[in-house]
Amino acid sequence: MLKKRIIPCLDVKDGRVVKGINFVNLTDVGDPVDASKAYYEAGCDELVFLDITATHEERDTTIEMVRRVAEQVFIPFTVGGGIRTVEDMKRMLQAGADKVAVNSSALANPQLLADCAEKFGSQCVVLAVDAKKEADGSWHVYLAGGRKDSGRELLDWVQEAVGLGAGEILLTSMDKDGTKSGFDLPMLEAVSQVVSVPIIASGGAGSSQHILEVFEKTAATGALAASIFHYGQVSISETKKAMQAAGLEVRI
């Protein structure tokens, strides 16, 4: 059985962490290596870096950041944002990323998933999906940070993507994102019914109870959050103790 994973998410731009992190022991809150080490020491299981760097020219700073993190942090980490080609993924993996996440580029060109999985293995290929509930009760996949409806139905898209080679799904609920009201349990459960790959739940975490709940009530194997960890509102070690007490498989 897969151990349940707690996964902080860090937004990076120009090789620096943005959306401040309020760790008292950080000398440089914007340094991804410092932030990663602090999370590693706090007991997180994995990390996700979302690169919001706009232009291709600035990619080199991201590659350098990945290299620095890989040298000093010894837990798996995923990098997403701006990955459009097999070559983009290759550069991230060669720099030391364990997995690479693709979102809008996979929607625009689903063959990218198959090409990357064939070259590097499905275990490296993460499908990131932003989804929102529609009036008819279905969920649609959204683009542009949840502002544009792709027209794709969520359950259809995840099945197609896994069939092409995605080895994991990072599933963000745009309805829940930023609300701190808990994860979107019905959506997570619906997706887990149609695919067999690991699912990381994202969007809505506001407390350690929400993390416990998503693991007890859905098949998600990872819980991703940003601000509750960045600002020290939730202790990773305390959450893990609560998970262990609830009988969940967890790395302490």
Curated annotation (Swiss-Prot):
Active-site residues (renumbered)? D11, D130
Identify the domain of life. Answer: Bacteria
Q: Name one Pfam family in it.
A: His_biosynth
Key words of the record: Amino-acid biosynthesis, Cytoplasm, Histidine biosynthesis, Lyase
Which pathway does it serve? Amino-acid biosynthesis; L-histidine biosynthesis; L-histidine from 5-phospho-alpha-D-ribose 1-diphosphate: step 5/9
Q: Name one GO cellular component term.
A: cytoplasm
Please provide, alphabetically and separated by semicolons, the GO molecular function terms listed in this UniProt record. Answer: imidazoleglycerol-phosphate synthase activity; lyase activity
- Its Enzyme Commission number? 4.3.2.10
CDD domains named in the record = HisF
Q: Where in the cell is it found?
A: Cytoplasm
Query: Could you confirm whether the keyword Kinase appears in this record?
Result: no
Provide the catalytic activity annotation: 5-[(5-phospho-1-deoxy-D-ribulos-1-ylimino)methylamino]-1-(5-phospho-beta-D-ribosyl)imidazole-4-carboxamide + L-glutamine = D-erythro-1-(imidazol-4-yl)glycerol 3-phosphate + 5-amino-1-(5-phospho-beta-D-ribosyl)imidazole-4-carboxamide + L-glutamate + H(+)
| One GO term (biological process) | L-histidine biosynthetic process
Where is the secretion signal located? none
| Main localization category | cytoplasm
Recorded family membership: Belongs to the HisA/HisF family.
Q: What does this protein do?
A: IGPS catalyzes the conversion of PRFAR and glutamine to IGP, AICAR and glutamate. The HisF subunit catalyzes the cyclization activity that produces IGP and AICAR from PRFAR using the ammonia provided by the HisH subunit.
User: Which PANTHER family does this entry report, sorted A to Z?
Assistant: IMIDAZOLE GLYCEROL PHOSPHATE SYNTHASE HISHF (PTHR21235:SF2), IMIDAZOLE GLYCEROL PHOSPHATE SYNTHASE SUBUNIT HISF/H IGP SYNTHASE SUBUNIT HISF/H (PTHR21235)
Q: How does it assemble?
A: Heterodimer of HisH and HisF.
Its protein name is: Imidazole glycerol phosphate synthase subunit HisF
Source organism per UniProt: Streptococcus gordonii (strain Challis / ATCC 35105 / BCRC 15272 / CH1 / DL1 / V288)
Q: Which gene encodes it?
A: hisF
